[in-house]
Amino acid sequence: MEVWGPDTDRSDRLWVVLLPGLGGDPEHFHWLARGLSASGWPLALVDHPGSDSAAVQALLEGRQSFDGAEALRQRLADLRAVLEAQRGGQLPVPGNRVVLVGHSLGALTALLAAGAQPVAGADQRCEAALAGLPLTNLSKLLQCELAAGRVMETPVVNPLPTAVVGLNSFGGLIWPEKKSKPLGIPLLLIGGTLDLITPPLDEQLGLLAALGLHGASRAVVVEGASHFSPIRVDGQASEEEGDDLFQLGEELVGVNPLTVQQLIALELIRFLNQLEGDPAAGGMQHLSDGTTRWHRLDRSSAARLTEQLQ
């Protein structure tokens, strides 16, 4: 685990736990940790041995198998250990209000830890979802593996998070819209239009409609961004080739990943700043910086859009 101290002091007493996704390492998110700490928030960046890049590389090379349920169980235990260490003073991170930020499986971990209760009937939903190979939503395969592993019934962490931020989050089969009990804390769910692993219509917008009752909850969809856009690998900041599991082509990474990462940091910092004040204006907002377009939606606009397009 890495600890990032703030460049400046804030009065909101917020601190952040950042959880990489499956196959992710802390180094992939140094860009985000740097931006958050520069804005005044202390941060713990968690490493998850057993489901990090080394574990996935071993899986790809046939040296070990992968148990999704066990990986999630271990990630939840890692998160509880971090929170307990901070609360007990063993982790040198100031603050008494925690925000959980996770990418993909890290976001699922954060939602479960925050008290999102899986809806009964996942077996039947999975049977219907997997009747055909879900090529446009590969997360369904992992969702169904986790549902079969009976690992998602987990106690809420202490302290309860002040908010949850999900980058390329998933859970549409776990928390179906109109059947789920919403969370009472703010959610920010960020995705991209080129994400074929956790597509925003099924996953981020669906999750916001299902769980995002709080008035400050938002989804942000970035045009041209993919599932791997939040991951920065060695050499990506220049024209060099990095040596990394996620050294992927544009067709998988999406367009302008560095610009997308800047937008993610911008939206996340905006969200954290607004936790202290009134929720931002609702509805759907269409934004552009001249090179990239993105869309900000509240719960009602996300629900309308998913209903119209399904």
Residue ranges and their predicted role:
Residues 211-233:
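Catalytic histidine neighborhood in serine/cysteine hydrolases
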Residues 199-209, 234:
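Short alpha-helix in the alpha/beta-hydrolase fold that links the catalytic acid
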Residues 64-92, 121-137, 142, 150:
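Alpha/beta-hydrolase active-site loop
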Residues 10-13, 18, 22-55, 173, ...:
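Short substrate-entry loop that stabilizes the transition state in hydrolases
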Residues 225-227, 233-310:
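Alpha/beta-hydrolase-fold serine-hydrolase catalytic core, especially in secreted/extracellular enzymes
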Residues 183, 189-191:
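Short beta-strand/loop motif that positions the catalytic acidic residue
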Residues 102-110:
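Gly/Ala-rich beta-loop-alpha elbow adjacent to hydrolase catalytic centers
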Residues 1-12:
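Short beta-strand-to-loop junctions in surface cap/lid or active-site-entrance loops
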